[in-house]
């Protein structure tokens, strides 16, 4: 399958290019979208990709787009994909409501998956969090996430995704149960998220389930950002023969 990388100059974008250099599990890098000059030397790649700032040409040259860019960039990408539908794997966070609506429109034409975190470990953490939230009905739930000091959004998209998982399991009102700034007494039907920023931490997420006399913590730590690139490529492979629809990352576990 031919892969197009959108957001190739970013941290994860560069890792995607590195993973695709020798052809990841039969995937071929066919196109790279860049706004300015691309620093990557493609002479060592098994196939020389199209490197372009022409969005329509970029989309035409691939069968699947993997996106790790910025919210505005995703909006532009979706406009092009609505004209020329291709499989989409998107890991960009902080998307506006209008952009998410365009994603739903594309899902009528092509398979797509949008996730805040592409690591297999986070996929499993989500499933464990759902089970713990469901079974430990009297436990207070708190989420702590830690990232590098250059991360722009807080709380992280992954932390919000974990919150949604826990709130859904409990039957909480997802719009009102979230607390990111705590003052005074804790309300029973609330889930808190604390965001820490410092150093070069790739990502750590911990969910605590606090009971009387004991507590359980479920934690995931990313020690290498390559897991996000590999995870996105695995998602692309999984979507290859799927019908047009917006898929959830937990569906990969069957």
Curated annotation (Swiss-Prot):
It catalyses: (S)-2,3,4,5-tetrahydrodipicolinate + NAD(+) + H2O = (2S,4S)-4-hydroxy-2,3,4,5-tetrahydrodipicolinate + NADH + H(+); (S)-2,3,4,5-tetrahydrodipicolinate + NADP(+) + H2O = (2S,4S)-4-hydroxy-2,3,4,5-tetrahydrodipicolinate + NADPH + H(+). It is found in: Cytoplasm. Signal peptide: none annotated. The keyword NADP applies. NADP(+) binds at residue 35. The active site is at 147 (proton donor/acceptor), 151 (proton donor). Pathway: Amino-acid biosynthesis; L-lysine biosynthesis via DAP pathway; (S)-tetrahydrodipicolinate from L-aspartate: step 4/4. One of its GO terms (cellular component) is cytosol. CDD domains: DHDPR_N. Catalyzes the conversion of 4-hydroxy-tetrahydrodipicolinate (HTPA) to tetrahydrodipicolinate. This is 4-hydroxy-tetrahydrodipicolinate reductase. It comes from Helicobacter pylori (strain Shi470). The gene is dapB.
